[in-house]
Amino acid sequence: MSKLDMDTPEFSANEQELIDKEFTRLERNQSTYLDHAGTTLYAESQVAHAAVQLHHDVISNPHTSRSTGDYVDQVRFKILEFFHTQAEDYQVIFTANASAALRLVAEHFDFGDKGNFHYCQENHTSVLGMRQMIQANGTYMLRREELSELREGHRVRRVMANGSSSTGNSLVVFSAQCNFSGYKMPLETIQLIQDDGLPHFGKLIAGQEDKETNGTAYNYYVCLDAASYAATNPLDLQKYKPDFVCLSFYKIFGYPTGVGALLVSRRGAELLSRPRQFYGGGTINYAYAHAMDYKLRNTSLHERFEDGTLPFLSIVELLEGFRSLERLIPTNSNTGISTMDRVSRHVFTLARYLENQLKQLKYANGQPLIQFYNHQGYEQRSRQGGIVAFNVRTESGGYVGFAEIACVASLHGILLRTGCFCNVGACQRYLQLDDQMMDVIYKRSGRICGDYNDLIDGQPTGAVRVSFGYMTRTSDVRKLVEMLEKSYLSSRSPERWRFIEKQASQLPKALQQRAQSLRPRLLELAIFPVKSCAALKAKKWPLTAQGLKYDREWMIVDRNGLALTQKRCTDLCLIQPSIDKDNLILMFNGDTNSSISLPLFLSDDDLQAAARCRSKICRQPIEGSDCGDQVAQWLDQNLGLDGLRLLRQSTQRSSSSHQLSLVNQAQFLLVNRSSVRSLQFEEPLDETVDRFRANLIIDTGAPFDELDYTSLSIGRIHFKVEGPCQRCDMICINQRTGERSPETLTTISRLQKGKMRFGIYITRLTDKEDNAELNEEYHLICGETLEVD
């Protein structure tokens, strides 16, 4: 047992018991929640209080009732108290979130004559967005070191020439805690900037470079993005006095969402003076409809900037958020350590423990499993918060894509964050991506923020982030460590297929000749009439302009109109469709073994009577006809859910020039049994093939050579290859039992050098492209040969 295993926990046994009782839903859902930097979890008593209050109280619009306004003002006072300040020093402007607070500063900060805008590279995307609307002389990006140098005595003495006053107001924005790595910026920097300016301007990004004053002719103001920091750390505005502080309360309490704040100091308030381009209700003394005259309120700062009606029902619930936090984690009566300081100690200890445990994970050849992304490690709580960012390495030193980690974690009931976390500057810094590589990633490869394009040329485009809250337990950390160890160190690494290990030229001549004479054939046809349900296997099947006839023509949606897939309900694989001359028959191969039949053909009157419904597949809108209450009740009964409906597509989507049914990407998905065989799973090969839910199954004799195809023919039908299929965690579901196992995903990633590609998407060539008559009925037939053009 390591020393860190024996650290004294921050919370007493009684406190931990009370905390656990507030988060019983985690155990009920078998969830391990490790994304507190995204949002923390709300205590169950918070939402219970909200329900009681909404049930019993009558809370009117604050523009109607002064009592509601007083209630909102109580929340303002509590916010100031929480951050150790008072109304004489700071004012609270409610916003939608921290991003909206940053926008407010960007819109209204008065840079004066020649003021500049400076921001730290490792900032949230919202800070980058400020650049689009500021009216500064120059915009500069500062590296973290250029700010931390202020603590080392490298100061600028502002001496005005001939006793003149400052010619501009410069604004410096940085995060109190980096939401990517958890690094904490020294808050002493705030006053040093305000008093002595910047020793380095940073890199000029836009505007005009100041070559004359070297920063001596500016007043400096600091905007502190405290959204990440304030969630798990004490922020004392009596000790550290930024001019602007941006907050999101859901990061502190989990509930309510949609409420943030901009705290403005008296000094900062003087600079929020740029003319408004818009005003809303509650912010003016008067306005004329017949003329442009209006006058803004000036009795208090927040009245000038809080447009319209505040989300007052959410704001009043903030009080219960403060109460819950202070009730569950009271100030330590023996040591005087405050609530938020105790939270800070708890999450830092967990982060340090996780780093210690992950450092011990190594492959047999000594290669560390984990690459960490932080500045100074986990030795000082004053410089590091409860966030651990990392990537997983392969045994050969390559990278495992973060999308795979997200899928494997999901299969283990662990919720964490992957990508760049809306902090592209930190992402570029930690992953050591130069500007040229950034262009490759975002402009040439087509990656966009939030997608799962995780490896490009073997290099990661993002990372994995784990973050903690006061309700996180040591057992949650252990579960993550065990998942990584089991998935990447303890599991059997699949061997390469012999055809790949031994080059073709090394085969005996007889086998070489035999291999050359063999042509791969279409072995199996699978049609999926109902999206995400079981396959209908056939030896021969007709084609339409959309692909295989009836393939993904029906879909099940929930009460919100969202498509139900096996990611949410694995029992869908137990619904076995079949089609006879006139009907679609659905059989549930579960407890009930019941079936239901639907007509394939409807009269015009029936079509007119059917309800029209809308949904989306891969962000493309689709429209369908509701198949009625009888089948809806059958689905509810067998799947154990409420409000399900069966839709039949009635309009065609368009992808490029090809029509699609309810498939995700292309008309057909093709899988090579040789590629499946190379995975070497212990289960029967047919079961593994079924996991990939392909329409066309071939066997080429060599794994993964289908990835080199650009076009192919099966019989007299010609196809072009759209590209490889990027797999998700649905392939981890056994299509015969509904059971999940992560081995499929992790094995594919290893074989594909960190990518999750398996199978290829193909599209039938149209008449324009291949002179084929799509109006003529064609069939695909098992046993037909496959020709690669």
Swiss-Prot record:
- Keywords in UniProt for this one? Molybdenum cofactor biosynthesis, Phosphoprotein, Pyridoxal phosphate, Transferase
Q: Which residues carry this modification: Phosphoserine?
A: 741
- Gene Ontology MF, one: molybdenum cofactor sulfurtransferase activity
Cofactors (names): pyridoxal 5'-phosphate
Q: Which PROSITE patterns match?
A: MOSC (PS51340)
Q: What is its EC number?
A: 2.8.1.9
Question: Known catalysed reaction(s)?
Answer: Mo-molybdopterin + L-cysteine + AH2 = thio-Mo-molybdopterin + L-alanine + A + H2O
Catalytic residues of the enzyme: 422
Q: What class of enzyme is it?
A: transferase
* MOSC domain location: 628-789
- What pathway does the UniProt record associate with this protein? Cofactor biosynthesis; molybdopterin biosynthesis
Q: Give the source's domain of life in one word.
A: Eukaryota
Gene Ontology terms: biological process: Mo-molybdopterin cofactor biosynthetic process; molybdopterin cofactor metabolic process
Q: Sites of the modification N6-(pyridoxal phosphate)lysine?
A: 251
What is stated as this protein's family in its record? Answer: Belongs to the class-V pyridoxal-phosphate-dependent aminotransferase family. MOCOS subfamily.
Q: What does this protein do?
A: Sulfurates the molybdenum cofactor. Sulfation of molybdenum is essential for xanthine dehydrogenase (XDH) and aldehyde oxidase (ADO) enzymes in which molybdenum cofactor is liganded by 1 oxygen and 1 sulfur atom in active form.
Stated name of the protein: Molybdenum cofactor sulfurase
